[in-house]
Amino acid sequence: SFPTRRSSDLDFHFGTKASGNVKFLKDNQKKYGYNLIVVEKEQYHNKDISSTSIRKKITEGKMQDVNEMLGHPYRIIGKVEQGKHLGRTIGLPTANIIPDETKLLPPNGVYRTVVVVEGQTFNAISNVGVNPTVETGTKIKVETHIIDYENYIYNEIVQVQFYDFIRPERTFDSLEKLKQQIEADIETCRRI
Protein backbone atom coordinates (compact mmCIF):
# COMPACT_ATOMS: atom_id res chain seq x y z
CA SER A 1 0.00 0.00 0.00
CA PHE A 2 1.05 3.58 -0.61
CA PRO A 3 2.20 5.52 2.49
CA THR A 4 -0.35 7.94 3.95
CA ARG A 5 2.34 10.51 4.60
CA ARG A 6 5.31 11.41 2.46
CA SER A 7 8.13 13.82 3.29
CA SER A 8 10.82 15.14 1.01
CA ASP A 9 12.95 18.18 0.40
CA LEU A 10 12.50 20.55 -2.51
CA ASP A 11 15.27 18.91 -4.56
CA PHE A 12 13.83 15.39 -4.24
CA HIS A 13 13.54 13.45 -7.51
CA PHE A 14 12.48 9.88 -8.25
CA GLY A 15 11.38 7.53 -11.00
CA THR A 16 12.60 7.07 -14.55
CA LYS A 17 15.38 9.53 -15.32
CA ALA A 18 14.49 11.27 -12.01
CA SER A 19 11.41 12.74 -13.69
CA GLY A 20 9.28 12.68 -10.52
CA ASN A 21 9.58 15.69 -8.22
CA VAL A 22 7.91 17.58 -5.38
CA LYS A 23 5.43 19.23 -7.74
CA PHE A 24 4.29 15.79 -8.93
CA LEU A 25 3.90 14.64 -5.33
CA LYS A 26 1.92 17.78 -4.41
CA ASP A 27 -0.35 17.42 -7.44
CA ASN A 28 -1.12 13.76 -6.70
CA GLN A 29 -1.84 13.85 -2.95
CA LYS A 30 -5.61 13.45 -3.32
CA LYS A 31 -5.39 10.93 -6.14
CA TYR A 32 -3.20 8.55 -4.11
CA GLY A 33 -4.45 9.46 -0.62
CA TYR A 34 -1.40 10.82 1.14
CA ASN A 35 -0.30 14.09 2.74
CA LEU A 36 2.96 15.61 1.58
CA ILE A 37 5.28 17.34 4.01
CA VAL A 38 8.08 19.32 2.38
CA VAL A 39 11.06 19.82 4.67
CA GLU A 40 13.96 22.19 4.34
CA LYS A 41 17.39 20.69 3.85
CA GLU A 42 19.67 20.74 6.86
CA GLN A 43 22.82 22.78 6.47
CA TYR A 44 26.34 22.50 7.80
CA HIS A 45 28.64 25.52 7.45
CA ASN A 46 26.10 27.15 5.11
CA LYS A 47 26.03 24.18 2.71
CA ASP A 48 23.26 21.63 2.21
CA ILE A 49 23.91 18.30 3.89
CA SER A 50 23.70 15.43 1.43
CA SER A 51 24.83 11.83 1.31
CA THR A 52 27.51 12.94 -1.17
CA SER A 53 28.89 15.60 1.20
CA ILE A 54 28.89 13.11 4.09
CA ARG A 55 30.71 10.45 2.04
CA LYS A 56 33.30 13.04 1.00
CA LYS A 57 34.01 13.95 4.63
CA ILE A 58 34.31 10.25 5.55
CA THR A 59 36.87 9.68 2.79
CA GLU A 60 38.79 12.72 4.06
CA GLY A 61 38.78 11.35 7.64
CA LYS A 62 36.97 14.43 8.97
CA MET A 63 34.95 12.51 11.52
CA GLN A 64 33.85 15.48 13.63
CA ASP A 65 32.26 17.02 10.53
CA VAL A 66 30.68 13.67 9.62
CA ASN A 67 29.21 13.26 13.10
CA GLU A 68 27.77 16.79 13.12
CA MET A 69 26.17 16.28 9.70
CA LEU A 70 24.73 12.88 10.66
CA GLY A 71 23.57 14.01 14.10
CA HIS A 72 25.23 10.94 15.63
CA PRO A 73 28.67 9.28 15.57
CA TYR A 74 29.69 7.47 12.40
CA ARG A 75 29.99 3.81 13.30
CA ILE A 76 30.70 0.33 12.14
CA ILE A 77 29.17 -2.77 13.65
CA GLY A 78 30.82 -6.15 13.47
CA LYS A 79 31.81 -9.36 15.17
CA VAL A 80 35.11 -9.46 17.05
CA GLU A 81 37.35 -11.97 15.26
CA GLN A 82 40.30 -13.92 16.61
CA GLY A 83 43.58 -12.34 15.57
CA LYS A 84 47.22 -13.28 16.11
CA HIS A 85 47.09 -12.03 19.72
CA LEU A 86 50.11 -9.78 19.09
CA GLY A 87 48.39 -6.88 20.83
CA ARG A 88 47.92 -8.99 23.93
CA THR A 89 51.63 -9.99 23.90
CA ILE A 90 52.66 -6.31 24.10
CA GLY A 91 50.05 -5.50 26.75
CA LEU A 92 47.62 -3.80 24.35
CA PRO A 93 44.92 -6.34 23.42
CA THR A 94 42.75 -5.47 20.45
CA ALA A 95 39.33 -6.33 19.14
CA ASN A 96 39.68 -7.18 15.45
CA ILE A 97 36.65 -6.37 13.33
CA ILE A 98 36.37 -7.19 9.64
CA PRO A 99 33.96 -4.54 8.36
CA ASP A 100 31.32 -5.27 5.76
CA GLU A 101 32.94 -4.77 2.35
CA THR A 102 30.19 -2.32 1.39
CA LYS A 103 30.79 -0.09 4.41
CA LEU A 104 32.57 3.15 3.61
CA LEU A 105 35.53 3.51 5.94
CA PRO A 106 37.60 6.57 6.73
CA PRO A 107 41.19 6.63 5.41
CA ASN A 108 43.71 4.22 6.86
CA GLY A 109 44.97 5.56 10.14
CA VAL A 110 44.46 5.79 13.88
CA TYR A 111 41.27 7.26 15.35
CA ARG A 112 39.88 8.14 18.75
CA THR A 113 36.83 5.93 19.04
CA VAL A 114 34.20 4.75 21.47
CA VAL A 115 33.21 1.09 21.56
CA VAL A 116 29.81 -0.18 22.60
CA VAL A 117 29.99 -3.70 24.07
CA GLU A 118 26.87 -5.31 25.54
CA GLY A 119 25.24 -1.90 25.92
CA GLN A 120 28.21 -0.31 27.73
CA THR A 121 30.45 2.35 26.19
CA PHE A 122 34.23 2.49 26.51
CA ASN A 123 36.88 4.89 25.25
CA ALA A 124 39.07 3.29 22.63
CA ILE A 125 41.65 3.81 19.93
CA SER A 126 41.22 2.17 16.54
CA ASN A 127 43.46 1.52 13.57
CA VAL A 128 41.77 1.32 10.18
CA GLY A 129 44.01 -0.39 7.67
CA VAL A 130 46.23 -3.35 6.95
CA ASN A 131 48.53 -3.30 10.03
CA PRO A 132 51.73 -3.09 7.95
CA THR A 133 54.08 -3.67 10.90
CA VAL A 134 52.78 -7.21 11.46
CA GLU A 135 50.79 -8.12 8.32
CA THR A 136 51.64 -8.54 4.65
CA GLY A 137 48.08 -8.66 3.30
CA THR A 138 45.89 -5.95 1.88
CA LYS A 139 42.61 -6.75 3.64
CA ILE A 140 41.33 -3.70 5.50
CA LYS A 141 40.27 -4.27 9.09
CA VAL A 142 39.47 -2.21 12.13
CA GLU A 143 41.68 -3.10 15.08
CA THR A 144 40.52 -1.51 18.33
CA HIS A 145 42.19 -1.28 21.72
CA ILE A 146 39.57 -0.58 24.38
CA ILE A 147 41.25 1.65 26.95
CA ASP A 148 41.30 0.27 30.53
CA TYR A 149 39.27 -2.82 29.51
CA GLU A 150 40.37 -6.41 30.12
CA ASN A 151 37.44 -8.68 29.20
CA TYR A 152 37.55 -11.17 26.32
CA ILE A 153 34.97 -10.25 23.71
CA TYR A 154 35.71 -12.68 20.89
CA ASN A 155 32.62 -13.41 18.78
CA GLU A 156 30.74 -10.50 20.41
CA ILE A 157 29.01 -7.98 18.18
CA VAL A 158 30.42 -4.52 18.92
CA GLN A 159 29.86 -1.02 17.63
CA VAL A 160 32.87 1.23 16.96
CA GLN A 161 32.03 4.95 16.84
CA PHE A 162 34.58 7.25 15.18
CA TYR A 163 35.37 10.69 16.64
CA ASP A 164 38.84 12.05 15.81
CA PHE A 165 41.62 11.26 13.35
CA ILE A 166 44.90 10.92 15.27
CA ARG A 167 47.51 9.99 12.64
CA PRO A 168 48.02 8.04 9.40
CA GLU A 169 48.78 4.32 9.52
CA ARG A 170 52.49 3.56 9.20
CA THR A 171 55.04 0.77 9.48
CA PHE A 172 57.28 0.49 12.55
CA ASP A 173 60.73 -1.15 12.78
CA SER A 174 59.76 -3.29 15.77
CA LEU A 175 56.85 -4.30 18.00
CA GLU A 176 58.43 -2.23 20.78
CA LYS A 177 58.30 0.94 18.65
CA LEU A 178 54.73 0.11 17.66
CA LYS A 179 53.84 -0.30 21.36
CA GLN A 180 55.43 3.05 22.23
CA GLN A 181 53.46 4.79 19.48
CA ILE A 182 50.17 3.16 20.52
CA GLU A 183 50.78 4.27 24.11
CA ALA A 184 51.43 7.81 22.86
CA ASP A 185 48.24 7.60 20.76
CA ILE A 186 46.27 6.52 23.84
CA GLU A 187 47.58 9.55 25.74
CA THR A 188 46.56 11.77 22.82
CA CYS A 189 43.06 10.28 22.99
CA ARG A 190 42.85 10.87 26.73
CA ARG A 191 43.67 14.57 26.18
CA ILE A 192 41.08 15.14 23.46
Show the residue positions of the predicted features:
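Short, small-residue-biased leader/transition segments that mark boundaries at the very start
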Residues: 1-7
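Glycine-rich, Lys/Arg-enriched anion-binding loops that position phosphate/diphosphate groups
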Residues: 29-127
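Short histidine/acidic/glycine/proline-rich micro-motifs that form metal-
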Residues: 11-16, 43-45
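Charged helix-capping and loop-helix junction motifs
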Residues: 18-25
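An acidic, carboxylate-rich microenvironment
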Residues: 24, 53, 65, 174-177, ...
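Phosphate/ribose-recognition catalytic cores of enzymes acting on nucleotide-derived substrates
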Residues: 83-192
